[in-house]
């Protein structure tokens, strides 16, 4: 999967189970370490960092419904670890009278590296990020 993502062609997607965007990245690193390829950890991290742009976390909330709870961007390496920057998050605000989780989506004051690339592809983002 990571080999395919690193070929230079845009548009890969995959899923895995984890507890957070950071854990998802750690799990990818661990899966590569479990492979028979004998690569040093820093090479594996570099490989993962180049392959992944965005991590979208979906959680099952207290009412049993699934919701996107975090969108984070891979922003490079920091202290020999893959660094993530959260772009959006869902913040729970309690339960409605019907027992549904209430909350709001928070947009952080961070313009992702992918912003210009998405704009060139015709995705209108000004309503979210401003100009």
Region locations from a protein language model:
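NTP-binding/hydrolysis catalytic cores, primarily Walker-type P-loop NTPases
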Residues: 64-131
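Conserved P-loop NTPase nucleotide-binding/switch module
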Residues: 1-79
């Amino acid at each position: 999967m990571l080999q395919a993502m690193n070929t230079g062609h845009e548009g890969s997607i995959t899923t895995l189970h984890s507890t957070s965007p950071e854990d998802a990245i750690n799990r990818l690193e661990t899966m590569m370490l479990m492979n028979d390829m004998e690569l040093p950890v820093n090479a594996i991290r570099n490989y993962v960092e180049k392959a992944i742009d965005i991590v979208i976390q979906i959680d099952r909330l207290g009412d049993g419904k699934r919701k996107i709870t975090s969108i984070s961007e891979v922003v490079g390496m920091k202290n020999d670890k893959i660094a993530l920057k959260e772009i959006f998050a869902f913040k729970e605000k309690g339960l409605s009278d019907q027992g549904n989780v209430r909350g709001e989506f928070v947009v952080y004051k961070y313009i992702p590296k992918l912003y210009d690339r998405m704009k060139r592809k015709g995705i209108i983002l000004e309503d979210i990020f401003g100009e």
